[in-house]
């Protein structure tokens, strides 16, 4: 929440979004990130991370919804080991924000990934690298300039 008040981010259209995620023990294994309304990732041979729910504001009531979605995806037994609640930044249009800060030279941003950060961060990182090092244009859907110009 404090990032919304940090001076160098005050021109960036971010908002706070809350949600739940879980760590569960299961024999489900995948080498891929599964992204079907929630993300499911193996963190070890026996554990998965599943999340996240999405609430505007600060509601800690998404665990049942998360478990129902997980049941649909993995179709295997699991034991919940840990329930997490967190707050993350999201852009106002729920798309990533990538690019050069509008007023501070040499400050580049990847933010606003919300709950899809695990699946979108590799793409956003590559886009930013190509922008900085190869002078390529950023994908207009993630370019922070869509809010700044």
PLM features: what roles do these ranges have?
Residues 2-105:
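Active-site substrate-recognition segment that forms the wall
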Residues 79-149:
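C-terminal catalytic lobe of FAD-dependent flavoproteins
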């Amino acid at each position: 929440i404090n990032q919304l008040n940090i001076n160098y981010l005050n021109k960036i259209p971010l908002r706070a979004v809350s949600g739940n995620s879980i760590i569960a023990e299961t024999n489900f294994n995948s080498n891929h990130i599964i992204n079907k309304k929630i993300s499911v990732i193996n963190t070890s041979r026996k554990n998965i991370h599943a999340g996240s729910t999405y609430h505007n504001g600060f509601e800690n009531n998404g665990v049942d919804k998360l478990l129902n979605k997980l049941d649909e995806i993995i179709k295997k037994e699991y034991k919940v080991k840990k329930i997490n609640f967190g707050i993350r930044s999201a852009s106002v249009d729920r798309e990533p924000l990538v690019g050069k800060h509008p007023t501070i030279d040499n400050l580049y941003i990847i933010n606003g990934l919300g709950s899809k950060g695990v699946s979108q961060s590799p793409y956003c990182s590559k886009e930013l690298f190509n922008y900085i090092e190869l002078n390529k244009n950023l994908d207009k859907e993630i370019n922070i300039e869509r809010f700044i110009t």
